Each structure stands twice: as C-alpha cells, then as structure tokens.
Amino acid sequence: MAGLLSTFDTFSSRRSESINKSGGGAIIPGQRSTVSVFTLGPSVTDDADKLLIATTFLAHSLDTDKQHSQRGGFLVSLLAMAYSSPELYLTTNGVNADVKYVIYNIERDPKRTKTDGFIVKTRDMEYERTTEWLFGPMINKNPLFQGQRENADLEALLQTYGYPACLGAIIVQVWIVLVKAITSSAGLRKGFFNRLEAFRQDGTVKSALVFTGDTVEGIGAVMRSQQSLVSLMVETLVTMNTSRSDLTTLEKNIQIVGNYIRDAGLASFMNTIKYGVETKMAALTLSNLRPDLNKLRSLVDIYLSKGARAPFICILRDPVHGDFAPGNYPALWSYAMGVAVVQNKAMQQYVTGRTYLDMEMFLLGQAVAKDADSKISSALEEELGVTDTAKERLRHHLTNLSGGDGAYHKPTGGGAIEVAIDHTDITFGVEDTADRDNKNWTNDSNERWMNHSTNNHTITIHGAEELEEETNDEDIIDIENKIARRLADRKQRLNQANNKRDISSDADYENDDDATAAAEIGGI
C-alpha cells in the first residue's frame, strides 16, 4: 500500500516532466519579422551628438504613429548604446524566434544640414529616406523628461556629469519600467517611481532626466507588445550573471534593477514556500494540504529545471507560468497567507481576498502562527543548547507579544470575496476543561470532525513523523478543537437562520397581494 501511495504522491511532478519533455520531432522554424536597429558608427565621437541620438531613439519609441515593432527596435537601439560593440551585444543576447535584427550604422556627415549632420548607411550603401525619417522634423506629443517641463538644459547637465552618466540614467529607467510592465501594468506608473527613488537618492538618475508618466506608460506598452524586446533584456541579465565579472557601473545598476525583475509574477508561489512550508508548523500534517504540497513540489521541480531563466518565466510568458498561480494550490496558499499576515505586518497589505481563498485554512494559518509553542523550532533547541527554563521564558514573552486578544486579520483587497469574521468565535487562550464539557465536546477528535465538519472533505491528521520539527499531540488536538468549535457554531447559526426563514415565509406569502395593491396606488 505504501508503494501505491508513493506513486500518487509523485504523479504531479512526473506528469509535468512528461508534458515538458521533448517529443523528438522535427524542428520547424516559425515566421520571423525584421526589425531595424541603429548603432553609432566610428565617426560619431562628440558626446552631445551621442546624447542627441539617444533621446531621438527614445522619442521614436514613444511615437504612436509608428508600428510597435519599429518602436521596439528603437528601444533595442537605445539599450545597445551601453556597449562598445552593439553588434556583439545583439549577437550574444538577441537570438530570438520572433525577430531578425537588421543593423544600420549612423555616421557623421557635416554636409547634411537637414538631418543634423547624420547619415544612415551600411557597408555598401547610404539610406537617404531612412535618414530623413529618423532625423527629420518630429513633433513630440509629450515631454520625454520631467526636466523639459522645467526648461532644464540637458547640455549643461552633460557638461557637469558627462555622457556615460546621462546615458546610464536613461537606460536604467527603461529597465525599471520592465519591473512592472508585464506582470502589473495597472500599477506601472506608481511602481516605476517607487523603484526609481533609490536611484535618485544615490545620484544615478538626475532630476532633469527623470521620465514623465507618459513616457513610462509608452515604454511599458511597447514591452507588452514586443516579447522579443523582453527576451533580449532577460538574456542580458542572464549573461551578466553567468559569464562576466568586469561589469561597468551601468551594468551593475542594471543588475540591481534585475533583482526586482527576478521572480516577478511569482510572489504567491514564493510566499507559499516561505510562510507555508519553510515555517514547518504542525498544520502541514493535515491531509487536505497533502495534494497542494504535492503540487507545490512538482512546481519546484519545474522551476529548477528552467535553470538560469527560471526567475523570468512570467515575464517571458513561458507556457508553464500559469501553473504557478495560487489557484492551483488554494488550501496551502490560504494557510500560508494566514501565517504571513501574523508573522510579517507588511503582508497584511497583500491582496488575499481572492475567489479561491479557503477561509478555514486562512484562519488556521493565523491560529498556529499566533500560538507561542509553534513559534519555537525544536530542530534548533539541541544545537543551541536551550534550557527548559529559557524556553519557558521565551514562550511567555511570545504570548505577551501576541496580545492575547485572539483577533483575526481579515482578507484584504479583491472585490470578489466578502468575508465577515466574528472575533469572538475563536480565542487563542487555553480554555478550561469545564468550559469544553459545557459545550458537549468529546475527547474523540475523529468524532468531532465527523459531526461538525461543514466541508466536503474530512480533515484528518497524519504523517506527523515526516516533519523535521517535532510536534506535540496536545498542540494538534488544540488546533482541532478550535476549528471544530468554529465549524459547529457556524452550522448552528445557519440552521437557526433557516428555521426563521421557514417560519416567516408563510406570512410573507400572505402579504404579497396587499403589497402589490399598495404599490399600484402609490402606497409603496
């Protein structure tokens, strides 16, 4: 029997592995679009010219009259300006199944006054019309930078801080947009300026070069429509992390932004592991958490199989990224969120009011997290040499810090769920045996669950020996008591409400005709 159950336990991970395994068929290339990328030729040496070209690329990327593929090409051109060899940068990181990059050089030609003295060319020919299209008159619908509203002199800024710092300020902001552009477009503008603040304080981004909100929204729209651009940026981060140690200041700043981009869209998955599993509390032995634990284990295997690109599966729109949504392991996620809102006050602002929230598991997570005994890790007691006296005093301090009011945190955010929590239903204090007898509670935990469970499944305790942290049977029974009492009270209130409705239904029916008549003559 044990072998049979172990087969079911590993089914989720083995199923995911078989689905993602290559079938060995022929690889048929898909259709690829051509995207133009512009790089600086050796004749462009003046810093003012370079900054002018950078702002020109940025302006074209925001031009809504252009195709999104063209706008994405201008952002690629801007990002490539950070490297001495843009061609090598694109060859290393720009290999993509969706696009083929065609590179054009921008050279200095003083005779061409209509196009600011520039010409677009390749090794074999010059492109007059492309040059006029790129450097001809262009109406900026909105300012690119907040400094333009204040008539800030970018040339003076260039003289003060130098070209690398000014270019770096622009490119870093493009990277910051990626943090929220794919996974949280609704909060893009707010998230951008929150992340930007650290770079403003350390002087990386000067105030005159801060993007306007419209610029941020425009870049975000291009990123959402051009997956090839996002793939290029992700490959840039992967290359930085795996093969280079001599990074420039700009590249180091990009890596800092990359820390925000990693695991974007995977917050629920990571928080479930952090608060639900790594805390190793006794509630993990509940049988209705077992399927979700197996699912989470298979997701961990999938995540690790992705290698260096695993943190980016959401922004890369990897086909498996939907499996990591918390709706696929709702009970374990709900329990983890209950633990989180108690252990981390910042998590109380996290949106937990979702349609798949399991309210009982959410409350259970809070209950075990507030319990003083469950906060003490027995796995470290022997290693640290904690005495019984010290452990008892620690338990006393934890009990005092918890407040002892037994209040629950309500789910936050999300209009799809409305939950009313009665704070007096369950208390975290220890009740007297006499009180339990008055409520007709039997000591047989199995009978309690059979009599008072309102769920479709019966919650049982099993596999406690699999936990690394030792658990006390009395703690488990106490948790059962608390949940069972709440379920029984809820069922009793529901029955009383149904009885009242049955009694009043006949009277309501008899008054229907009178109410209708009154409405017709304007009485109601």
Curated annotation (Swiss-Prot):
Q: Where is this region: Disordered?
A: 496-524
Bias-annotated ranges (Acidic residues): 505-515
Region span, Ntail: 405-524
Entries under Pfam families matching the protein = Paramyxo_ncap (PF00973)
Q: Where is the region Ncore?
A: 4-404
Localization per Swiss-Prot or TrEMBL: Virion; Host cytoplasm
Q: Does the keyword Ribonucleoprotein apply?
A: yes
Query: Gene Ontology cellular component?
Result: helical viral capsid; host cell cytoplasm; ribonucleoprotein complex; viral nucleocapsid
Residues annotated to bind RNA? 180, 190, 195, 260, 350, 354
Q: Does the keyword RNA-binding apply?
A: yes
Q: Where is this region: Homomultimerization?
A: 440-461
> What GO molecular functions are on record for this protein?
RNA binding; structural molecule activity
Family affiliation: Belongs to the paramyxoviruses nucleocapsid family.
According to the record's subunit comment, the protein's assembly and interactions are: Homomultimer; forms the nucleocapsid. Binds to the viral genomic RNA. N0 interacts with the phosphoprotein (via N-terminus); this interaction allows P to chaperon N0 to avoid N polymerization before encapsidation. Interacts as N-RNA template with the phosphoprotein (via C-terminus); this interaction positions the polymerase on the template.
State the domain notes: Ncore is globular and carries regions required for self-assembly and RNA-binding. Ntail is an intrinsically disordered monomeric domain in the C-terminus.
Question: What is the name of the protein in this document?
Answer: Nucleoprotein
User: From which organism does this entry originate?
Assistant: Human parainfluenza 1 virus (strains A1426 / 86-315 / 62m-753) (HPIV-1)
